[in-house]
Amino acid sequence: MSAKIWVVGAGKGGVGKTFVTSSLGITLSKLNHRVLLIDFDISGANLHTTFGENPKAKNLSNYFQKSTPLKDIYYGTNIPRLSLIQGFWDSWSPTDLSVDQVKKLVVDCRELDFDYVLFDLGPGPSVAHLELFLAADERILISNSEPTSVEKNYRFIEAFICHSLKQNSTPDSHSKLENALRTYREAHKKGVFSFRNHLSNECGFTFDFFERLQEKPLRLIVNEARSRQDQDLGHSIKSVCNKYFDLCIDYVGCVEFDNAVWQSVKSRDPVLIDKPFTPLAGQFLSICKHLTNPNLNANYYRAVI
């Protein structure tokens, strides 16, 4: 049985992707799953710091630049069943990864002896990020209540749909498609718009890939929720995406603001290990139960593990 791949991303930096990725990984490991975390923030790898680790000589750059097998660059953490691959360290010489390189990485990850492989992406919709999202079993988008975070996530979703279109069309048809969308946006001056309706009604384009995208919907987690309004933000984002993108978003839950998080970051200990009885533990358990077994109502899982 091949490893399942979860990819955690966001349109904006500083919204808690690394915190969420590490917490999901820890929770899965406590549920007796074998988990590998991969730091895919090409310009600012820091997932290792969350676990109090120092930089390793072997990291993801060895895989891409020296063809080192993945099994030779991951290492165990002090948490049972949880392993880690550190990200790029030569950020002064950024690496632009191709679609083919990412596809090979996905194939190699599935062959590893893990139940789950979680990617912690850098901010924004690079081609490598979008290709990983397209290939993933679970596509997890992180937002907080800041308007800039919400806006950039809409941009990320828009870019993801366009990337999906590109991978499912010929170069000529994709060029026509981009021109049609650009003309529509300039005419309406809107930040988001209905891809599917415009392409079908005005340009004659028809696609069935929207239905295929719905088979693995984007999952949304709202981080650092401080109020009921913040908790309800996920439902608002879901509604907007359905209206303008004709895309279903699954709002899997929110993670409440907790001072224990920044305190644990300063001490370089994962919050779910340093403070195991924080309410965050139950929130991440609920999310993981929803993702690993969507037929169950994860809202009933509030036990601290």
Tell where the protein language model's regions lie, with residue ranges.
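Beta-strand-loop-alpha "switch" segments that mediate conformational coupling across diverse proteins
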Residues: 210, 215-216, 221-224, 242-270
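G-domain G4 guanine-recognition motif of GTPases
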Residues: 11, 144-145, 170-186, 218-231, ...
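Conserved ATPase-coupling elements of RecA-like P-loop NTPase cores
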Residues: 95, 121, 125-132
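Walker A/P-loop NTP-binding active-site region of P-loop NTPases
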Residues: 4-69, 116, 129
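Short mixed-charge
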Residues: 165-218
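Inter-motif core of Ras-like GTPase G domains
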Residues: 128-148
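NTP-binding/hydrolysis catalytic cores, primarily Walker-type P-loop NTPases
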Residues: 248, 262-305
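P-loop/Walker-type NTP enzyme "switch/lid" segment
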Residues: 40-115, 171, 182-186, 211, ...
